[in-house]
């Protein structure tokens, strides 16, 4: 029986590439998305990967979404925290809404999603959690104080969670890509 992998933001850009690669490697893949229904349906039709719509910035939406995926596909063995947004502007022009949207989606979603799957992984003594950060989480970027802060937080979250679960058969890693020409 194939292991189940869930990729957030898994229907476009980096997430779509990850979803397709996991399917090619033999995983039973689910891809979540937040807003572009047409792109998600096209992705599903072209790749045969089921898609699920929810907002990763909402804990309750993540709980309901994960429950639906696990009911339909089985327990999630691999979680790829990939969903992300930008609301770029210089800090002195940044609104609280721009700050919160990016922090809640790009960092808060790691808690929201991982919290839904970690207990099952611990019980099964197996799990893989991979979070997609960014080079800008390591060096910062003009106009991306919110994004850089969130992506730096992703790195800290991952390191701490890895330590907590190292002896339980769960690996937790972060990938910090450089600049990639893809929409977010």
Where are these regions (language model features)?
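The beta1-alpha1 cofactor-binding region of Rossmann-like NAD(H)/NADP(H)-dependent oxidoreductases
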Residues: 54-65, 96
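Active-site loop immediately N-terminal to the catalytic Tyr-X3-Lys motif
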Residues: 92, 139-145, 167-168
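Active-site helix of classical SDR
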Residues: 114, 150, 158
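Substrate-binding pocket helix/loop in short-chain dehydrogenase/reductase
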Residues: 90-91, 98-103, 129
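Alpha-helical segment proximal to the catalytic Tyr-Lys
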Residues: 119, 163-164
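Residue(s) in the substrate-gating loop at a strand-loop-helix junction
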Residues: 134
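Conserved glycine-rich cofactor-binding loop
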Residues: 11-12
